[in-house]
């Protein structure tokens, strides 16, 4: 799948996961990290008020406070200063590719939600190893149980909302959750926007 453009690939994200990667990108730049990692993305998704990941955390009885502490510690271990170079990590692109496979072939969906992303990570050895390195709490997740019961586990999530999946039937364009706007995400100077006060504060 290496020949698939980023615009096409990231255009498959639903509103929640797309906004999550936007926030992760801004967060990464403001921290001065070298690349946008899965760690940034998961951290930002969990910073939201609710979503698939929150319901999965509760279902498998992860310690949310310890998880948050572990993710913060993992962020602090990341190398800083890319010397002007800034990009997505290979793990982010691989996670989206694998999530798209699970999303379409396993669940018959047109947009990747947070649960699809986590299922894909858990079923890809290298990505799973990276997840466990972020926090031992992720070791409580059972890959097959999550994959088999995902829809029931995340039932009621804001990602069920029609507005979160509306992009699936919308024409590709700058106002859709995906489409060509996905490519623009990596060409906008978010650091400059932050300096000019055009970005909302990210916690």
Region roles according to the model:
Residues 1-203:
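Histone-fold recognition with a strong bias for associated Lys/Arg-rich disordered tails
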């Amino acid at each position: 799948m290496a020949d698939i453009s980023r615009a096409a690939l990231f255009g498959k994200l639903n509103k929640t996961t797309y906004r999550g990667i936007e926030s992760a990108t801004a967060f990464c730049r403001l921290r001065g990290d070298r690349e946008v990692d899965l760690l940034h993305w998961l951290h930002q998704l969990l910073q939201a008020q609710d979503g698939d990941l929150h319901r999965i955390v509760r279902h498998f009885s992860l310690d949310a406070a310890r998880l948050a502490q572990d993710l913060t510690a993992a962020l602090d271990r990341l190398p800083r200063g890319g010397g002007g170079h800034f990009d997505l990590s290979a793990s982010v692109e691989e996670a989206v590719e694998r999530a798209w496979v699970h999303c379409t072939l396993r669940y018959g969906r047109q947009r990747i939600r947070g649960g699809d992303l986590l299922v894909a990570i858990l079923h890809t050895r290298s990505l799973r190893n990276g997840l466990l390195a972020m926090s031992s709490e992720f070791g409580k997740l059972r890959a097959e149980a999550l994959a088999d019961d995902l829809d029931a586990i995340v039932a009621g999530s804001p990602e069920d909302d029609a507005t979160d999946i509306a992009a699936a039937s919308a024409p590709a364009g700058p106002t859709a959750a995906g489409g060509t706007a996905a490519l623009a995400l990596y060409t906008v100077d978010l650091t400059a926007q932050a300096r000019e006060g055009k970005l909302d504060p990210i916690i």
